[in-house]
């Protein structure tokens, strides 16, 4: 943080709270008197700038527990690293800029990737395996914007490609790249449907068969698939 913003890092004024149905004491509210477990379930985890605290879903039947059971505890670490990314934004003034939500979410994904990259390179107190990194990416994809949604809609987090791309930028290039994403954001993958037919196909390209003429193949898919694969693997 000092290298990126020229100031010392200030620890959270609040804390990191685990939310679960049986929790005996109330969770602090974010603009409300208290935070309910249902509120936390909706977001899986969130950072509250008003109280400078983080809450995450620690319920045994919650999505985070399900992902951790399937893919490992690395999912929890990367989700919390994303929320700490928002805490960084609070301290650096990014959250005061009234940016589109997806812009701040991209930077938070990038900071999570930078933290995971450090762990994967054994540069900190925590070490990550490839499986841990993969688990974190899966967790991000679980809360991606659905196909057809404009990423600039209120609350947009980015399509799956957007989230993975931001994570990768941080993982490979480090936190300095993340700091630049406000002025130099990553391009977003088109996520909206072009027309009604596109919506009916859920954004998938036509397979390339003309059902009106049996046996006659339309080369739409094959027309762009082969050049794309050659470009990727070339």
What kind of region is each of these model predictions?
Residues 1-4, 79, 106-116, 164-167, ...:
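Short, structured motif recognition centered on aromatic/hydrophobic residues
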Residues 5, 103-105, 109-146, 223:
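Short helix/loop segments within enzyme catalytic domains
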Residues 18-55:
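Catalytic zinc-binding patch centered on the HExxH motif and its immediate surroundings
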Residues 20-21, 57-60, 79-82, 90-93:
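Active-site-proximal beta-strand/loop segments in catalytic clefts of secreted hydrolases
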Residues 83-99, 114-121:
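Catalytic Zn2+-binding segment of zinc metalloproteases
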């Amino acid at each position: 943080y000092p290298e990126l913003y020229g100031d010392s890092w200030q620890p959270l004024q609040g804390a990191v709270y685990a939310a679960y149905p049986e929790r005996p004491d109330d969770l602090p509210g974010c603009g409300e008197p208290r935070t309910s477990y249902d509120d936390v379930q909706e977001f899986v985890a969130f950072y509250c700038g008003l109280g400078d605290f983080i809450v995450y879903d620690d319920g045994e039947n919650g999505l985070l527990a399900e992902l951790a059971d399937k893919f490992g505890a690395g999912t929890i670490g990367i989700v919390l690293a994303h929320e700490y990314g928002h805490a960084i934004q609070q301290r650096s003034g990014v959250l005061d800029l009234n940016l589109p939500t997806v812009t701040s979410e991209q930077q938070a994904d990038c900071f999570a990737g930078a933290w995971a990259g450090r762990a994967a390179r054994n540069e900190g107190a925590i070490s990550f395996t490839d499986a841990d990194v993969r688990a974190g990416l899966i967790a991000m994809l679980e809360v991606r914007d659905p196909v057809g949604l404009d990423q600039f809609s209120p609350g947009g987090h980015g399509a799956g490609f957007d989230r993975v791309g931001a994570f990768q930028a941080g993982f490979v290039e480090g936190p300095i790249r993340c700091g630049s994403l406000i002025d130099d954001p990553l391009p977003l993958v088109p996520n909206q449907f072009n027309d009604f037919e596109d919506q009916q196909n859920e954004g998938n390209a036509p397979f390339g068969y003309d059902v009106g003429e049996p046996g006659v193949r339309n080369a739409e898919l094959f027309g762009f698939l082969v050049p794309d694969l050659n470009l990727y693997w070339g």
